[in-house]
A protein has these predicted regions:
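Catalytic glycan-binding domains that act on GlcNAc-containing polysaccharides
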Residues: 1-151
Length: 151
């Protein structure tokens, strides 16, 4: 969105947090043009996705899976997890496991599916990188040690 509350992607995602209108509607948000509504809807959706992985994914890993699902969709992440298992990787760990399977799906994919996996992979990698950078800022690192939620 590049911080544009009126942004619309080629796939139809809208507003600051680039939600599909149908998804936002299912979460109870009809109008995403107000930044507050867009942010609230995006956070609620990410929280909902994180809950989808509650049973099998360790707590510290759930955010990465939820972010991939936010970008790609839950079924795409499940497909990558299944491939990770077939590749003898851990389907419940992101880095070096499902991440590798997603890269393989991006490499294999034809049509629109392959690039979507690649985009989701880059999306999660970018956020993980920023997260690492923010954690290294002394005041933020201190806040994290004092009980702020981790990944």
């Amino acid at each position: 969105s590049q911080f544009n509350p009126a942004a619309q992607s080629p796939s139809g995602a809208v507003s600051l947090l680039q939600l599909m209108p149908r998804t936002a509607g299912a979460l109870g948000f009809a109008n995403l043009t107000r930044p507050e509504s867009s942010i609230h809807a995006g956070v609620k959706y990410l929280y909902t996705l994180r809950g989808e992985f509650q049973q099998e994914i360790p707590v510290g890993e759930r955010t990465w899976f939820a972010l991939a699902a936010y970008n790609l969709g839950l079924s795409g992440v499940e497909k990558a997890r299944a491939l990770a298992g077939r590749m003898a990787l851990d389907p419940n760990r992101w880095a070096g496991n499902v991440e590798k399977a997603m890269a393989e799906l991006a490499r294999r994919g034809g049509g629109v599916e392959g690039p979507r996996y690649g985009q989701a992979l880059l999306y999660v990698r970018a956020i993980r990188s920023l997260y690492g950078s923010y954690r290294s800022v002394p005041s933020l690192a201190l806040a994290n040690r004092q009980g702020e939620p981790s990944a």
